[in-house]
Curated annotation (Swiss-Prot):
Pfam families per record: HHH_5 (PF14520), RuvA_C (PF07499), RuvA_N (PF01330)
Signal peptide positions (record): none
Family: Belongs to the RuvA family.
Chain residue ranges for the region called Domain III: 139-190
Function, in words: The RuvA-RuvB-RuvC complex processes Holliday junction (HJ) DNA during genetic recombination and DNA repair, while the RuvA-RuvB complex plays an important role in the rescue of blocked DNA replication forks via replication fork reversal (RFR). RuvA specifically binds to HJ cruciform DNA, conferring on it an open structure. The RuvB hexamer acts as an ATP-dependent pump, pulling dsDNA into and through the RuvAB complex. HJ branch migration allows RuvC to scan DNA until it finds its consensus sequence, where it cleaves and resolves the cruciform DNA.
InterPro entries noted in UniProt: DNA_helicase_Holl-junc_RuvA_I, Hlx-hairpin-Hlx_DNA-bd_motif, NA-bd_OB-fold, RuvA, RuvA_2-like, RuvA_C, RuvA_C_sf
Cellular component terms per the entry's GO annotation: cytoplasm; Holliday junction helicase complex; Holliday junction resolvase complex
The protein's name: Holliday junction branch migration complex subunit RuvA
Record keywords: Cytoplasm, DNA damage, DNA recombination, DNA repair, DNA-binding
Subunit structure: Homotetramer. Forms an RuvA(8)-RuvB(12)-Holliday junction (HJ) complex. HJ DNA is sandwiched between 2 RuvA tetramers; dsDNA enters through RuvA and exits via RuvB. An RuvB hexamer assembles on each DNA strand where it exits the tetramer. Each RuvB hexamer is contacted by two RuvA subunits (via domain III) on 2 adjacent RuvB subunits; this complex drives branch migration. In the full resolvosome a probable DNA-RuvA(4)-RuvB(12)-RuvC(2) complex forms which resolves the HJ.
Main localisation: cytoplasm
């Protein structure tokens, strides 16, 4: 129903923001780790998920549409409501959660408050099936860096492992390559 809201941020709290657009202030619940990227009195765009309940209407917001899509997949899982899904995304970012699922790391999922071993297993089971469609959304820059590391003689698995640990879309290619080479050179020396 609401794909995104673009407007001026009026209030920033750890778990919610108020964003004003068209003379209306929308209260939007966000993952706690997202609040550090949003500043008061700045224009921003938040991708949203509208949850209509019998007693309330809630808006959940995310900086990326892919994180919103993951939130919507999480709330489809039996026993995971919007509050638990936002709690999961407050603890782990999207890529970290994908890696946890990919490695079937029940221990890391169980560290999230409110998630026990059975719920963690259910999350792994449900999301593992859709992981290929949600897979890490690496862009052209990631592919170019991986290609450069392969051209320098590193093995694909080794280069990909290092790159997956340090890749950040906000860093420039040269910085990521330098950091990757530093780590890979350290492995060769062992």
């Amino acid at each position: 129903m609401l794909d995104f809201i673009k407007g001026k941020v009026i209030t920033v709290k750890p778990d919610k923001i108020v964003i004003q657009t068209g003379g209306i202030g929308y209260s939007v619940k966000i993952p706690i780790r997202v609040s550090r990227y949003i500043n008061r009195d700045e224009e921003t765009q938040i991708f949203t998920s509208l949850i209509v309940k019998e007693e309330s209407i809630e808006i959940y917001g995310f900086l990326e549409s892919s994180e919103r899509d993951l939130f919507e997949e999480l709330i489809k899982i039996a026993g995971i409501g919007p509050k638990m899904a936002i709690n999961i995304l407050s603890t782990y970012d999207r890529e970290t959660l994908y890696k946890i699922i990919d490695h079937e790391d029940i221990k890391s999922l169980s560290k999230i408050p409110g998630i026990g071993k059975k719920t963690a297993q259910r999350i792994l089971l449900e999301l593992r099936g859709i992981l290929p469609s949600l897979q890490y959304e690496k862009d052209q820059k990631y592919d170019d860096i991986l290609s450069a590391l392969l051209n320098l003689g590193y093995k694909r698995l080794e280069a990909k492992e290092v790159l997956d640990k340090i890749y950040n879309n906000e860093k420039d290619e040269a910085t990521i390559i330098r950091e990757s080479l530093s780590i890979l050179a350290g492995k060769d020396g062992k």
